[in-house]
Amino acid sequence: MTNAGADGERRTPLTVSMGARRASGSFSGRANGHLPTVEEVSAGGVVITPASKGFDVAIIARYNRGGRLEWCLPKGHPEGNETYQEAAVREVEEETGIAGSILTDLGSIEYWFTVPTHRVHKTVHHFLLEAVGGELTIEKDPDHEAVDVAWVNLDELDRILSFPNERRIVQTAQQVIQDSL
């Protein structure tokens, strides 16, 4: 199954995996006329706050390269020697304005997409975070990728999030929350 990613590129979602690895950033060779492959990694998460009905989650909206608005979980690349957890906390705060504290690992998703010069195999590590401060804003996003941010009830995310693989991460978060109550 192929869909367009937040950056407008075609992506093929793979299964949710619990493996952890850093992207090498290296290219596989251009054998038999195939595009070289670059490994990328990101981290982000499901940041929750108590709401009148269960929990709300901070999500962001971005325009893909085709100009379509897509709602997704906040995420981004680790910087320097950041761990996935540190990158997730930083990216969530940059893209949503909400400071979060990690509660648990929710697993990883993998997908492929192609840009004109290469194919990208991307792994995104997700964490469940508790909101501990801040206010919703996109003003802290240094890349200005997010065009909107919103608190959405956890039970409504399945119909709002643009990507099936992120909806599966939210289902994992729902199960973790249910198991802890």
Regions found by a protein language model. Give the residues of each.
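A short, polar/proline- and glycine-enriched secondary-structure boundary/capping micro-motif
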Residues: R68-C72, V147-A150, Q171
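N-terminal acidic, proline/glycine-rich, low-complexity intrinsically disordered segments
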Residues: M1-T15
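Unchanged
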Residues: P78-R168
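N-terminal strand-loop-strand
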Residues: V16-L73
